[in-house]
A protein has these predicted regions:
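Active-site phosphate-binding strand-loop segment of PLP-dependent enzymes
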Residues: 1-73, 78-88
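PLP-dependent aminotransferase class I/II
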Residues: 10-14, 19-25, 32, 48, ...
Length: 178
């Protein structure tokens, strides 16, 4: 709270290892200060806070689908928001500012003719990575069940360790990132 200035535009809570931040307090403070909240949910895909999935609370949430995350597409990620203006802006800049819709590539549209209305970046994933991600979504329930089981084994094996400490985990709401 001490770091907030008149230049601050957003708060970015980072959910580490599947654990959520205290989102109620963060959103209450953000609303009071008229700030956006951008959740970094790269480690928390499948985790919950107050019975709702992480990433479903506020302005923007970002997920990573890198090879070591809870769900993978090899590389890439996802930005989610209920704000149509944010989504439109993200779509406008995701492919180096090129405005053509992805669907037009396969509809006979002359895909070599492009409109660039603003500077953009390469924020899109390849079709191959997207296909891998879709397949992983279908397997997520089983993958997260195995991940939770593995974590319980680690918890049991290390619970008496004098050099390793760990969080007290509620596996009903946490999808651990290990």
């Amino acid at each position: 709270k001490k770091k907030i200035t008149s230049k601050t535009k957003a708060i970015i809570p980072v959910h580490i290892a599947g654990y959520s931040e205290n989102l109620s307090e963060i959103y209450k403070f953000a609303k009071k200060k008229n700030l956006r909240v951008i959740e970094d949910a790269a480690h928390a895909f499948g985790s919950k806070y107050k019975k709702k999935l992480i990433g479903s609370f506020g302005d923007i949430a970002c997920f990573s689908f890198d090879g070591i995350k809870n769900i993978t597409s090899g590389e890439g990620g996802c930005l989610v928001s209920r704000d149509k203006k944010i989504i439109k802006n993200a779509k406008d800049i995701r492919l180096l500012g090129v405005k053509n819709d992805t669907e037009k590539r396969y509809s006979g549209h002359r895909s070599w003719i492009t409109d660039v209305e603003q500077q953009g970046w390469r924020y899109h994933m390849s079709d191959i990575n997207a296909a891998i991600g879709i397949a992983q979504f279908k397997r997520f329930k089983n993958l997260s069940k195995k991940r939770r089981l593995l974590c319980k084994v680690y918890d049991e094996r290390f619970k008496y360790s004098k050099i390793i400490s760990y969080f007290d985990i509620d596996y009903n709401i946490t999808c651990p990132h290990i």
